[in-house]
């Protein structure tokens, strides 16, 4: 890299390069405790709906050249019939799979992936998908 004027004189033909990843698909997992919400924080169903909206739109008003075009593509929510939960979170997270579609060697868009949720979930749990 050219870092000084002396370097510039010696390395006049050197150009910088940035390595890029043309497309990346990130997965994030999180939790909301209904029991803690009721007992401690006062977190309401209205707050929960606002949280879902905030997650879905979190990059819309925060564009950055460093992050490229980041966007939340889908929110997969597991709802439990019981306040304490009907299944451990790891089983629910394991029910979500992301795979490249056949014939796609180098993904370039979200459409190059298939995101699925297992058809059978533990009793007392249902899935809601938002995009």
PLM feature segments, named:
Residues 1-131:
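Basic polyanion-binding and macromolecular-assembly surfaces
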């Amino acid at each position: 890299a050219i870092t000084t004027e002396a370097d510039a004189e010696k390395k006049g033909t050197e150009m910088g390069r940035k390595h890029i990843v043309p497309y990346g698909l990130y997965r994030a997992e999180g939790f909301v405790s209904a029991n803690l919400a009721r007992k401690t924080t006062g977190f309401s169903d209205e707050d929960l709906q606002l949280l879902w909206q905030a997650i879905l739109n979190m990059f819309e008003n925060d564009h950055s050249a460093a992050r490229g075009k980041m966007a939340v593509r889908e929110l997969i929510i597991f709802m439990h019939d019981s306040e304490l939960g009907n299944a451990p979170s790891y089983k629910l997270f394991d029910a979500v799979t992301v795979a490249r579609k056949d014939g796609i060697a180098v993904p370039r868009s979200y459409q190059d992936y298939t995101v699925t949720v297992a058809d059978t979930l533990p009793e007392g749990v249902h899935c809601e998908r938002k995009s």
